[in-house]
């Protein structure tokens, strides 16, 4: 009797573990995260108390949705052996359940529900900045003007001023650490995304000229506020593919929205149509 009870308990535990891997629900992700936090106290000691461990490292980290594949394989092997140890079921029935479960338990495949939820990541642009996005589009695409480069105040300078502003407000150390990480992440995303996602077609010849004139300079040292604002229209789609869990993503969005409020507060000095100039006839020919 005791051996049968143990076998039954083993099957129940293994089935529960296997279900956790198959269904990356929010509750399972949270439980996985809690287990990881308990086992990594040494590393957690160096992190700020109010930050999720996934936020440092420029908004990256290991996702709770992708457990090590070795854990899954071990669970499956035990599951196959269990029926033979208990009630003496026929051997022809043993291979059938694992075959069905192998197709569904692949830890590298994200569920449709989880994918759709990630596609819903949105960064809210303050109402004060939306008219400027429209004017920026009109100046470039309809009036055929170009933002003058290098910018009078580049992206690096804007981010540095924001970081200094937050630090001057007397924030505690862990808050200051978070601001540095967010500012660094914005800069990295800007430099990666500018050439492929943040330019209008009419601006591409100008971008090519900048690359020739400043081959070693990051674009955050060349471009300014209008292109930085465009980043926040696009960045939500990129964040949907980061390995941040729900808590870390919500924390990050809070910091991004705080930065956008800073841009809105200083919009009069950061956004002005006088920074644009009508493109020459020669440039028009290049842009065709």
UniProtKB/Swiss-Prot annotation:
Which of UniProt's keywords are assigned here? Chromatin regulator, DNA damage, DNA repair, Growth regulation, Nucleus, Phosphoprotein, Transcription, Transcription regulation
Q: Where is this region: Disordered?
A: 1-115
- The keyword Cell inner membrane belongs to this UniProt entry's keyword annotation: no
Listed GO CC annotations: NuA4 histone acetyltransferase complex; nucleolus; nucleosome
Residues found modified as Phosphoserine? 71
Alphabetical list of InterPro entries matching this protein:
MRG, MRG_C_sf, MRG_dom
Q: What is its main location?
A: nucleus
Gene Ontology BP annotations: chromatin organization; DNA repair; positive regulation of double-strand break repair via homologous recombination; positive regulation of striated muscle cell differentiation; positive regulation of transcription by RNA polymerase II; regulation of cell cycle
Q: Where in the cell is it found?
A: Nucleus
Subunit details for this protein? Component of the NuA4 histone acetyltransferase complex which contains the catalytic subunit KAT5/TIP60 and the subunits EP400, TRRAP/PAF400, BRD8/SMAP, EPC1, DMAP1/DNMAP1, RUVBL1/TIP49, RUVBL2, ING3, actin, ACTL6A/BAF53A, MORF4L1/MRG15, MORF4L2/MRGX, MRGBP, YEATS4/GAS41 and VPS72/YL1. The NuA4 complex interacts with MYC and the adenovirus E1A protein. MORF4L1 may also participate in the formation of NuA4 related complexes which lack the KAT5/TIP60 catalytic subunit, but which include the SWI/SNF related protein SRCAP.
Q: What does this protein do?
A: Component of the NuA4 histone acetyltransferase complex which is involved in transcriptional activation of select genes principally by acetylation of nucleosomal histone H4 and H2A. This modification may both alter nucleosome - DNA interactions and promote interaction of the modified histones with other proteins which positively regulate transcription. This complex may be required for the activation of transcriptional programs associated with oncogene and proto-oncogene mediated growth induction, tumor suppressor mediated growth arrest and replicative senescence, apoptosis, and DNA repair.
| Protein name from the UniProt record | Mortality factor 4-like protein 2
Q: Organism, per UniProt?
A: Rattus norvegicus (Rat)
């Amino acid at each position: 009797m005791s051996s049968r009870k143990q076998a039954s308990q083993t099957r129940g535990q293994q089935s529960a573990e296997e279900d956790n891997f198959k269904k990356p629900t929010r509750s399972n992700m949270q439980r996985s995260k809690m287990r990881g936090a308990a086992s990594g106290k040494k590393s957690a000691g160096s992190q700020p108390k109010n930050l999720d461990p996934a936020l440092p490292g420029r908004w990256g980290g290991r996702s709770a949705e992708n457990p090590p594949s070795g854990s899954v394989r071990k669970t499956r092997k035990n599951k196959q052996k269990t029926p033979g140890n208990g009630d003496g079921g026929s051997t022809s029935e043993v291979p059938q359940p694992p075959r069905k479960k192998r197709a569904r338990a692949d830890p590298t495949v994200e569920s449709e529900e989880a994918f759709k939820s990630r596609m819903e990541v949105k960064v809210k642009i303050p109402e004060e900045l939306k008219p400027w996005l429209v004017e920026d589009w009109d100046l470039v695409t309809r009036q055929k003007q170009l933002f003058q480069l290098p910018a009078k105040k580049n992206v690096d300078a804007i981010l540095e001023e924001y970081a200094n502003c937050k630090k001057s407000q007397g924030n505690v150390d862990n808050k200051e650490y978070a601001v540095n990480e967010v500012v660094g992440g914005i800069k990295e995303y800007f430099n990666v995304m500018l050439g492929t996602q943040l330019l209008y077609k009419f601006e591409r010849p100008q971008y090519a000229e900048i690359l020739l004139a400043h081959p070693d300079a990051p674009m955050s040292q060349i471009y300014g506020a209008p292109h930085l604002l465009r980043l926040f229209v696009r960045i939500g789609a990129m964040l949907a593919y980061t390995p941040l869990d729900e808590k870390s993503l919500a924390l990050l969005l809070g910091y991004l929205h705080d930065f956008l409020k800073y841009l809105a507060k200083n919009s009069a000095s950061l956004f002005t149509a006088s920074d644009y100039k009508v493109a020459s006839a020669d440039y028009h020919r290049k842009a065709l």
